[in-house]
Amino acid sequence: MQRSLKWFASATTLAMLFVLIGGALVTKTGSGMGCGRSWPLCNGQWVPDHITPELIIELSHRLVSGLAGIMVLILSIWAWRAIGHVQETKFLAVISFVFLVLQGLIGAAAVVWGQSDFVLALHFGISLISFAAVLLLTLLIFEIDKTFSAASLSLDGKMRFHIYGITIYSYIVVYTGALVRHTNASLACPSWPLCAKTRLLPVQFHEWVQMGHRLAAAVIIIWIAAAAIHAVRHYRRQPVIYYGWLIALLLVLAQMTTGALVVFTQLNLYIALAHAFFISCLFGVLSYLLLLALRTRRAPVKAADHSAGEAAPATLK
C-alpha cells in the first residue's frame, strides 16, 4: 500500500473527527447563528466585518467541514482505485462522502430556514456515520484486518447478537445525546444519576429528555459490559474481538464519566467536548466490529479455538 495514501487517509480521519468536535462546539456555545441566516456566506459577506466569538466558531466549523468534504472525496476516489478489490471499499467510499454532504445540507438548512430540535439532533449522527466510514476505509488501507488475522474469525451467535444489537442501539443513544444538546437540556437535572435528590421521576420536558438519555446510556453500558465479559471468556485467542470489546468498555465508561462531570461542573466546555470525542471513538470501534461480523456471516463457518479448552462457536451457548 502506498505510504502517501496511508498518510492521507489518517489526515482525513482526523479531519472528520474535527468536524464532529467542531459541530459539538457550535452547539455547546450556541454559535449556530454566528453567521446569521446566511450560507455559505457569513452575514451575507465573504469576509465578515463584524467579528464575534460565535462567528469565529461557526465560520471555522464551516471551513473545516468544507476542507474535510474535499479530503473525503479525494480519499474515496483514491481508495476506490487503490483497494477497490477489497469488498467493502466501494460501499464505504460512497457512504463516507454521501453522508458528509447530507450533514452539510442539514446544517445549511438549519441556518437558512431553521429546523426543529428533533431534526437538528440527526446532524451529529449523520456526521458520525461519515466519520465511521472514513475510519473503516483507513483501517482497510492500513490492512489492520491482516494484522489481527481477521480473515480467520469465527463468531458464535451470541457475539453476533451483541455486535449487531449494540451498534444499532448506540446510534439511538447518540441521537438522545444530541437531542439533549439541541433542546438545551444538559443541565435540566441538577443531580446525577437521578434527576433530583428529592424525587425519582422527571416532571417536565427537558428533564424527560435528559433522563431518557441517561437511561439509554445506562443500558448500553450494561450491554457493552456483558459483551466484554463474553469476549474475555470465549475470545482470548481472537485479539481483534477480545481487545475490541475491552476498548469499547473503556470508552463507554469514559463516556459515562464525562457525562456525569458535565453535570457536576455545570457544563464545562472541555468536558462536554470530551464527551463528544469518546462517543465518536466508541462508534468507530463498534463499526469495525460490525464490519468483521458481516464478513464472518458471509464466510463459511470455521471451527475456531476461542480459548484454551473452549468448544467451537457452533457449540457455544
UniProtKB/Swiss-Prot annotation:
Keywords, in A-Z order: Cell membrane, Disulfide bond, Heme biosynthesis, Iron, Membrane, Metal-binding, Oxidoreductase, Transmembrane, Transmembrane helix
Membrane topology qualifier: Multi-pass membrane protein
Annotated positions binding heme b: H213, H275
Cofactor annotation: heme b
Ranges that cross the membrane: 7-27, 63-83, 91-111, 122-142, 160-180, 212-232, 244-264, 271-291
Cytoplasmic domain ranges by topology: 1-6, 84-90, 143-159, 233-243, 292-317
InterPro entries per record: COX15/CtaA_fam, COX15/CtaA_HemeA_synthase, HemeA_Synthase_type1
Molecular function as annotated in GO: metal ion binding; oxidoreductase activity, acting on NAD(P)H, heme protein as acceptor
Active site: E58
Residues binding heme o: H61, H123
GO cellular component, one term: plasma membrane
Function: Catalyzes the conversion of heme O to heme A by two successive hydroxylations of the methyl group at C8. The first hydroxylation forms heme I, the second hydroxylation results in an unstable dihydroxymethyl group, which spontaneously dehydrates, resulting in the formyl group of heme A.
Record text about domains: The N-half (TM1-TM4) and C-half (TM5-TM8) domains are connected by an intracellular loop. Each domain is formed from four-helix bundles and they align in a pseudo twofold symmetry manner. The N-half domain is the substrate-heme O binding domain and the C-half domain is the cofactor heme B binding domain. The cysteines of disulfide bond Cys-35 and Cys-42 may be involved in transfer of reducing equivalents from quinol in the membrane to the active site of the enzyme.
Protein name: Heme A synthase
Gene source species: Geobacillus kaustophilus (strain HTA426)
